[in-house]
Amino acid sequence: RPRGEPDRRDHRQPDGTRRRKRGASLDPAGYDAGKKTAGRKRHVLVDTLGLLLSVFVHPADIQDRDGAIPLLRQARRLFPFIERIFADGAYRGEKTANAAAATGAWKLEIVQRCDLRRFVVLPKRWIVERTLAWISRNRRLARDFERHAHTVAAFVRLAMIRLMLRRLAATP
């Protein structure tokens, strides 16, 4: 064969377009019809500095207000001293309010969007969005590579540990 000519037996796709086969995910990955995305949703509970307190991962076909209930139960066990929780409008509803009331003396406040048709920073919601952006900078969390939801939750925790360690080690 002449030099520079591809081998006829090599049927692979060119670099950059090659796809690896993935085994079937053991945990179900649903489809969120509202956002038109498949995969999983990550619910995070953060403090006022944006540091992770708790994380819960579930298939995307479960509504946000239903996915918040296990997160609230988990957080109540770990952090009984929390008094107030600020949440997105997706967590509005009786189920979430009842779950927050059942866990103790928590006050659940839904942060509403303003009626203006332009971008407005909502301070309480911005804390969580900023934390999710910090977490998504990690390669393993930029896309859904994992087969188990608990593995995704573990990588979210690791990403936050890495971020906090960098901040602690930073010289003033």
What are these regions (language model features)?
Residues 1-105, 109-113:
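Polybasic low-complexity intrinsically disordered regions
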Residues 97-98, 103-105, 110, 117-172:
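Basic, amphipathic alpha-helical segments enriched in Lys/Arg and hydrophobic/aromatic residues
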